[in-house]
Structure formats: C-alpha cells, structure tokens
Amino acid sequence: MRFTKMQGIGNDYVYVNCFEEHVENPSELAKQMSRRHYGVGSDGLILICPSDVADFEMKMYNADGSNGGMCGNGARCIGKYVYDRGLTDKTTVSLMTDSGLKILNLNVKDGKVQTVRVDMGMPELFPPKIPVDLPGEVVMGHRLN
C-alpha cells in the first residue's frame, strides 16, 4: 500500500490516497502504522477520499484506532497533498470532515503549496459538549481538583 507521512506543526499523520488505494480496516491500520517503535509512527491515519458534497473527504483515525473526527493541522496537510499531487488545481478547497465542511485556502508559489489556512469555525467551549473518556464516575458541571 502506498502512503505518505506528513506533519503540520508537529501533528504527524500517515495519509492514504483513497482515490488510488482501498483500505479494508482503517481502524486496525491506524493502530499498526502509528506504533512509533514497530510501525511508521504517527498520531494516526488520515484517508483522503472522494466526496459527493465537497472536493474531498477526510476520514481520520487516532493512533489507538478510534475515530479522530477532525484535526486542523491534518486538514492543512491534505490541502498541500491534493494540490501538489495534481488532484486539484483549486486554491480554495472544500473538505468534508466528521466535524462538518471545512474550507482550505491554499497559498501557492511556483506551483507548490507554501501555506494552508483552514476555517475551523467557532470552537465548542461548552463543557458538557466536549467529550472526555476517562475511567470512573461521570461528572458534569463540577470543578475537579
């Protein structure tokens, strides 16, 4: 399987172009490839997929195989990947994610992407809507020491 490893401000992911490759079990692949000492080593796996509603779709898996939802730095790397490899000639790219539609603005110089800006939308800061999976009793709306 062909893949690319990229990083954006230290967030490193393994990228698979699903226009060319088929990934049977992305959760398991993420776990195997992300192992730092026995795999490629990464924060997770990002699949670059076709989309019916956007230019591309991002499917992200954390190193433990769980669904990652969305990563801004990962999305920025997708912008560079799809432009530099000729999958698009647009400098404004729409990207469907599990967190909704994101718009990537590519700054191109001499035919290569120099920077990518992602409109991430408004952050969610309401504590009950921010998932945290920890062992023990569920506590909402209380300060923890």
Predicted regions and their residues:
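Active-site proximal loop and beta-alpha junction motif in alpha/beta enzyme cores
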Residues: 1-70, 75-145
